[in-house]
Structure formats: C-alpha cells, structure tokens
Amino acid sequence: MAVGLDRADKSNYALRLKEMFNKEIRLQCRETNISKMSSKFHDNLLTAMEKADWQQRELERIERQLVLNRQELEKRLLLEKELTRELEATKLQEATVREHNNELMECIHALKRATGTSINHDALPARVKGVTVLRNTDGDQWIPFDLAVTDTEGLNSLCQKLQSNNIDVNKWRQLVSLATEMSMKWNYSTPNRRDNAKVDIIEIDLTSPTNQIIL
C-alpha cells in the first residue's frame, strides 16, 4: 500500500515537472516572439522616422523652391510692368514723332507749292537740303542749298535771297523751325559734309542745257 502511494507521488511529481518544463518552453517561445515583434517594431519605427526626416527635408526644399519661384514671379511681373510702361512711352514717342513728321511734310508741300522749292526728305531734320527755282523774265535760275539746321548764317542768307526775289518765306521759316525742334528733341545728328566746308548759295542759269541738279 505504501509502495503504491510512493509510485503515485512520483508520477504526480513527474507530471508537474513536465508541466513546468513545458510551461518554461512556452514562456521562452513567447519571449522569443515578443523579442522578434519588438525588434520588428523598432525597425519599422526607425524606417518611419527616417522617412519622416526625408519628407521633412523634402518639404523644406519645396518650400524654399516655392519662395524662389515666388520671388522670380514677382521680378517677372515687375519687369512686365516696366516693359509695358516703356512700350507705352515708346508708342507715345512714336506718335509724337509721326505728328511732327506730318507737320513737317505739310510745310514741305506748302513750301514747294508757294515758292517752287523742293526739299530732300531724307536729309531732314538734321540738314536742310534741296533746290529752289527763281522764275523771272530773264530766265529761270536754280538755287541749290545744303545747310545744317544749326547753320544760322547760311539759313538767313538763303531766306534773304528768297525774300529779295519776292518769295514768301513764312513757310520756309516754319519748316526750319520744326526741323530744328525735332533735331534737338530727338537728338538727331547732323551729317558732316565730305569737304567740311561751308556751303555757299549758288545761282544756276536754267537756260543753259548743261546745268542739272540732283538731290
């Protein structure tokens, strides 16, 4: 009877020992799984943090680029406004030049009709160049002229010559005044003559077939 109880105690002890051993194994497996899960969690966390850092740097880069783009856009808008102002100013200047040119051409045509004077348009406004015809009973005479608008002495001499032949010089003076104004306002340069010499008023007898004037 005592022997049977002893065997039963040993059997129970073995079972408890086995159960404890199995429980220890399960605990070790659980710890291993927890360790693996923890390691994976930390790896994922590190990856997420690195990705967050990259995204932050990328966001800062994009923000800097946006600031640069905004500054560039503002510069272009300012440049566009400046170009628009310059364009309007240029259009206004061109309109003023056209108006002056129209007035100048009107004077030229009126002068030609009133005095028989032809003007070289290409020489204006820096120079007053052309030829006038004096008609009288003794024969027609051509008076060519090529004067800078700043040559006051030459212009006065020509006006006196025209006036002495009973030619109205009002349109002539208006023409010279407009040419002088345009020359000063728009900074036209006065072409130099090849000989740099003062041009005298020359009378040419039209009755001679060999005399020709080319403007």
Curated annotation (Swiss-Prot):
GO terms for cellular component: Ndc80 complex; nucleus. Keywords: Cell cycle, Cell division, Centromere, Chromosome, Coiled coil, Kinetochore, Meiosis, Mitosis, Nucleus. One of its GO terms (biological process) is mitotic metaphase chromosome alignment. Residues 43-114 form a coiled coil. This is Kinetochore protein Spc25. Acts as a component of the essential kinetochore-associated Ndc80 complex, which is required for chromosome segregation and spindle checkpoint activity during meiosis and mitosis. Required for kinetochore integrity and the organization of stable microtubule binding sites in the outer plate of the kinetochore. Participates in SAC signaling that responds specifically to disruptions in spindle microtubule dynamics. The NDC80 complex synergistically enhances the affinity of the SKA1 complex for microtubules and may allow the NDC80 complex to track depolymerizing microtubules. The keyword Transcription regulation does not apply. Belongs to the SPC25 family.
